[in-house]
Amino acid sequence: MEQRSKCLDEKIPYRLALSATLERHGDSAGTEKLFNYFKNKCIEYSLKDAIENDMLVRYYYHPVVVSFESEELNDYLELTKKIGKLILGNKKKEISDQAKMLLIKRARLVAAARQKVDALVDEMKDYMEENHILVYCGATTMKDVDYKEGKPLEEEKRQIDIVMKRLGLELNMKVAKFTSEEDAQKREILKREFDEGESIQALIAIRCLDEGVNIPSIRKAFILASSTNPKEYIQRRGRVLRKCPGKKYADIYDFIMSPIPLDRVDSYNESIVKMSASLVKREIERMKDFAALAENSSEADEIIYELMDKYQINYLDEEEFYE
């Protein structure tokens, strides 16, 4: 933001900004600079306004809770401890390059949790004959379902490849990849075939909803890797809700990470629960945001209450390990 803030020329008397998400995630100073420069909002048109004015379709929100396997949980806790030491040991509370690398590594671990693909397959069994489905994967690698300890690193595959394999071979669905690897011409062909709903039932994608790609025929979205950055998940949701002939509503399946299986949280000591709760809090914030405008908000509310109860979120100290 420091370099870009130099573009905010104070000599310019007339200023107008248009943004879907003006607040900068994790950058309160940058957000303050923007508001100070452009001053008060003159017009605000919210997602709620767009839905109520029939500019976007209504939607149903379905949180799907998944957890780490034992090895993954141990890795997550170890990374969280290291991050905490690096940040809390810095008197300026600045995030060092080393801490940033660990944060990225931890985020990838969350995105690639093996249970997510298992849960996706279970959910998708109800829609094996349907079409206009989007599966949103993380740009990350994960161990294949056939992985065995001691095998070489090439056994680790991209999450998208594992999803393609399991939906295509295990459920016999007609699926296609939609990523930055496909050129513009190929993407247009995929979009057309997806719209027609005959040769492609589901697009398995990475980042396509962050790049301005317009696929309004999406009726069901399964989000395996959801950002904690409101800017990103607000944009993704808005694109899923775009109108299309015959599309009355959309379904959004959001895979929520509870580091510890909910039925086992009580068996872990307080320090482990507390370290895990910082991630759960961020997941809850996203769930609240999605549920607020959903047609079935009570479905998410029940899961939110259970997560808060299990992780004692009302009673924990405000101090958290950083995102």
Whereabouts are the PLM-identified features?
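Short, flexible/disordered intra-domain loops and linkers
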Residues: G26-E32, T141-R158, L262-V280
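Conserved helicase ATPase core of P-loop NTP-dependent helicases/translocases
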Residues: L134, E156-D210
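Long, largely alpha-helical accessory region at the distal end of helicase-like NTP-driven motors
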Residues: R264-E323
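Loop/turn-to-beta-strand initiation segments
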Residues: I12-A17, N131-H132, E198-A202
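A short beta-strand element within the Helicase C-terminal
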Residues: I204-I206, E211-S227, E232-R239, Y249-F255
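Post-DEXD/H (motif II) to motif III coupling segment of the RecA-like Helicase ATP-binding lobe
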Residues: M1-Y59
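Conserved segment of the helicase C-terminal RecA-like domain
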Residues: R239-M275
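Interdomain linker/hinge connecting the two RecA-like lobes of the SF2 helicase core
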Residues: C42-M173
